[in-house]
Curated annotation (Swiss-Prot):
Primary subcellular site in the record, as a coarse category: other
Residues of the propeptide: 1-12
Recorded family membership: Belongs to the archaeal flagellin family.
UniProt xrefs under InterPro entries: Flagellin/pilin_N_arc (IPR013373), Flagellin_arc (IPR002774)
Localization per record: Archaeal flagellum
GO CC terms: archaeal-type flagellum
Transcription as UniProt keyword: no
One MF term in the entry's GO annotations: structural molecule activity
UniProt-recorded name of the protein: Flagellin B2
Residues bearing glycans: 38, 72, 77, 113, 172, 208
Function: Flagellin is the subunit protein which polymerizes to form the filaments of archaeal flagella.
Modification after translation: N-linked glycans consist of the 779 Da trisaccharide beta-ManNAc(Thr)-(1-4)-beta-GlcNAc3NAcA-(1-3)-beta-GlcNAc.
Upper lineage: Archaea, Methanobacteriati, Methanobacteriota, Methanomada group, Methanococci
Amino acid sequence: MKIKEFMSNKKGASGIGTLIVFIAMVLVAAVAASVLINTSGFLQQKASTTGKESTEQVASGLQISQVMGMHNNSNINKTAIYISPNAGSSAIDLSQAVIMLSDGSNKRVYKYNESSYKDLTNGGDIFDNANVEWIKATATKFGIVVIQDADESCTAANPVINKGDLVAITLNTTSFSTTPRTSITGTVQPEFGAPGIISFTTPATYLNDSKVVQLQ
């Protein structure tokens, strides 16, 4: 009788122990599942953000439609680079852009000068010597001439360009040796996205009756 009672108690204790182990396993599995779900959610959000940034990086950038120059019979002393955002590009803040230009012997880095800004959306002569973008031009600062800007996003203090905008970057290139047949290379590098590529060779001769020439 005592043996049967002992065996019954032993089975009861064993059943309780098994139940405790089972509950512990369920709790551990629940915690593990919660951690996995949270980690999965974080990784998904991170991947989505990274993918969006990568898409913006690839799609965004600048394109150069043409480069015009004005010469003084021996060198190109004024250069205007016409730029617009790439198709599908995010808005680009030109105050953060950097322009690098080289003639093979010299290299110049230009940054934006807020005082060298001109709005010509109603028309005008970009190469007019009286324009502030040339008066304030230096060997290290570039100016901006706004040609097309429907939403008026490109201002002197915040020169941001977006879809449909067209501006000219103005450079004082007097410090370069841009004599005839000189190769010029460079980039207009925005804060993010693809740069605009500058690559041209100056004309074989500079004619008095044609002060403004197309370079690229």
